[in-house]
């Protein structure tokens, strides 16, 4: 969850104003080159912070302070960076480090700052008027499963006490051994007992373990891009890799450029099943197909009719890592109510160029997509074409709405934070 749940009572809004004293508002000045990124007409960007390290998700407090989850990488600082703009110029000039545990998902809820690490959910009590919490972290959930691959965890809250955490599957398509040419998938896939889904916990109860959670949705490979919006949980999933490498008799390198799609799902009820590892969504045929590990040849649907289809789909291998719905009014009307999605970018489209180093916008009408997506922010890779992912200058990782309706974007390469504003045409 990247913003506060809408629908607060007036009393709670007043309480938050005491916890987060507001700073002087100012129209920020954008960089001449938008900090190296490209935006639609009427938009511009400034670099609000830089050099933070491997920045993941971020969240803005009501007064404009921003909290950024920093991943644990060898030799890097880890924890949460708390950022404050003390003079209203749009750039953060005060920085404090909270904790020393790296994570991905981050949220502010009812006076607490939450962080999802690969194995836990932690929270700190916010101190009125202070940028940095004074006390130590409390453990909300511990013993979350992780086996290295797909360990990053996002957070979402339903506003009724429910805390939702993704548990990614440490696998490509449930083969044993994993990622081997011609090896069939395990059927049923045993990983789905403890991985490959969303688990629900009580946000108000400390000391929970994974065993205390309930599986809310399943059949999802990896999905740190989760958020609660308009009464439902929304997810953008990282789909399987290298379909041509492991099954060349059915799929070519050209097929791998477009298969499978990165799907967006809405969880309508507890127990929804989205079909991984048995099926994938085909971006060109617009339907679920059997994975080759389960007998698929790129045409057969088989058992896939029993699983929920996506509400939207994005090109193969773009790697969605964060999503937030826009509830502000600064941006033009067409953006209001839609979803901004941070894509980390592909690594396995060779021999074709890599792709998907962007922030994309998916328009919505109510709780349904209302048209084709548009690539909103580009230029993160720093070169076009990009052949090797390790040559990318930046990779979008987090998106969060500021109190004034501008949009923050984080970079996991060197820790740059962009603030995107609408100036008008």
Ranges and model annotations:
Residues 71-73, 118-120, 126, 168-170, ...:
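Short loop/turn segments immediately following the C-termini of beta-strands
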Residues 60-64, 108-110, 157-160, 227-231, ...:
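Residue-level detector of Asp-centered blade-edge/turn motifs that repeat once per structural unit
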Residues 65-69, 112-115, 162-166, 232-236, ...:
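Conserved beta-propeller blade signature
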Residues 400-425:
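Blade-level signature of beta-propeller repeat domains, shared across WD40, Kelch, NHL, RCC1
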Residues 26-39, 152, 169-211, 218-222, ...:
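Beta-propeller domain segments
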Residues 94-98, 103-104, 109, 119-158, ...:
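Asp-box/WD-like beta-propeller blade repeats and closely related beta-sheet repeat scaffolds
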